């Protein structure tokens, strides 16, 4: 897959000269699809360990462990971003789900996608939506 780059306008707030344009099915700096990583996050939030998740996905356990560690460390921050997106769509939306970083990330991603889906009555795929609204930084 060829990743397109665009030149950044002369904006003082921009620290880079160009930016990669990732499709919403890819997570920044990851090879696997957002839906695969999202499934792993959902399974972990449900209490499944990294080895069974890896076996189900056919992905090395070390890869899944890396996703889960990264999500545990940054999930709260990513969830806050997604909560802001959810509130734009539904200001009266519910409070963010409790739990650790991964559980909070999974719950908030689902709530945000559902809130936006309600605006158009069109289905919104949770993990593509989350990737698009975190600029590809689903794992921070």
Residue ranges with predicted function:
Residues 1-15:
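Cysteine-rich micro-motifs
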